[in-house]
Amino acid sequence: TKDMMNEMGAAFAVTWLVFGYTVWTGDAMMSETELVGIGMGGGLMAVAALAVVWMAFAGAHILPPVTWMHMMTGELDDTDAWMANGLKLAMQIVGGGLALVTMAQLNPDGVTYDESMTEMVDGVATVMAMDAYSFDEMRLLGGIAAGAILWCIHSKTDNPWAMSIGVIAMASYIGAEGSTDMASMLMNKMGDLVPTLLAYLEAGLAVGLGAMLAMKIDENLD
């Protein structure tokens, strides 16, 4: 549908413009790396790029935390809404994946998944697995708090610039790059499926719970 294509296009754009793609500055594994793109730490440029994408793709959630907030603050027994939002999450992953594939074709010196996971073990370059998922209570609480703040920004301002500032400021707490991380993992043999998926779900649920909490508090204050 048009909404799903809009979501995919928005995810493609934000992955390309903001998240970027890491490349080698020289020979692979022998040189430094640099980011082609603005990056989430790009300050005002990142805020501006994200705001422009939100305005250009009006109606798209673009980022997983925004979709999770809508899921958890809507009617929880509305299966149609859950399916629609689930499709949005899927299209965000597809859009991010398409952007990664395109950037890889345009940047032959890009860092591959295996290269990014390679470490020297006894003098031998060894591809390592991602660390196993471990539950962190403070990380969960941080996600809930960030979700509550982000929902207040989203519901009270309805302003892409305000949302962009909130997302960039709290990116590490809300799993802003979750869809691109999922896309990267799925396109690379799914070797780190479990830790990547669990981190993605934890961040989404934490942000969603935070948004629900903020909504309930706001309702009780009226």
Which stretches of residues belong to each language-model region?
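Membrane-interface helix-loop junctions and terminal tails of multi-pass membrane proteins
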Residues: 1-222
